[in-house]
Regions:
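Active-site metal-binding motif and surrounding structural segment of the metallo-beta-lactamase
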Residues: 39-88
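Conserved beta-strand hairpin/beta-sheet module of binuclear metal-dependent hydrolase folds
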Residues: 1-48, 142-145, 151
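Generic structural signal for residues in well-ordered beta-strands
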Residues: 15-18, 109-112, 129
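Short glycine/serine/proline-enriched coil/turn segments at secondary-structure junctions
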Residues: 44-47, 102, 136-138
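Short solvent-exposed loop/turn micro-motifs enriched in small/polar/acidic residues
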Residues: 20-24, 114, 172
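Short, well-ordered amphipathic alpha-helices
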Residues: 66-72, 93-99, 144-145
């Protein structure tokens, strides 16, 4: 794999956090097991398979590589990425991508989704991202990723997965 940028790694339980940050230079992190990334101040080749990104704010050390990442995914015939960012930045980012698209003479397809403090984003039945306001010179949000788990009631803990499924399908509340 091409090593075009520094990547540090931290393993915590069943999750890996990879990326790098240097204030006013570049910030990019991802959790590969969850297929989520945070900020695109630069973009290592190894991060291409990460389809969903969360941008904290619009300083260049956090967004400079966003157009490059979108273009690379298009050139590699990958699905357009989904990029969450502060709602105040959406219109300007759309215009920026249009300008880059004209300069590059190629489309830059992506889903830009606005977020505000207090939003709860359901990525799947179990994976949720909650946003929070951050203090910074520009509009900024922080992200908390968590897994929603519903525990089985004690009387169903010895049942097999098939039995639990059948109970749920019959209308029984097992959690």
């Amino acid at each position: 794999m091409l090593k075009n940028l520094p990547v540090k790694k931290l393993v915590h339980g069943d999750l890996t956090i990879e990326g790098y940050s240097r204030a006013a230079v570049q910030t990019y992190w991802r959790i590969p097991e969850l297929k989520l990334g945070f900020d695109l101040g630069a973009h290592p080749w190894g991060f291409m398979g990460t389809p969903t990104w969360f941008i904290s704010h619009t300083h260049l050390d956090h967004i400079a590589a966003l157009p490059v990442y979108v273009a690379r995914r298009r050139m590699m015939k990958m699905e357009p990425p989904t990029i969450y960012m502060p709602e105040s930045a959406i219109e300007m980012m759309e215009r920026l991508l249009q300008c880059f698209s004209r300069l590059d003479q190629g489309r830059l397809p992506c889903k830009l989704i606005p977020v505000a403090a207090g939003d709860e984003i359901e990525l799947s039945r179990e994976l949720v991202v909650t946003t929070a306001a951050m203090k910074h010179r520009v509009k900024s949000v922080g992200y908390c990723v968590w897994r929603r788990r519903s525990k089985l009631k004690s009387e169903y803990r010895d049942h097999t997965g098939d039995q639990i499924r059948d109970l749920r399908l019959s209308g029984v509340d097992v959690s």
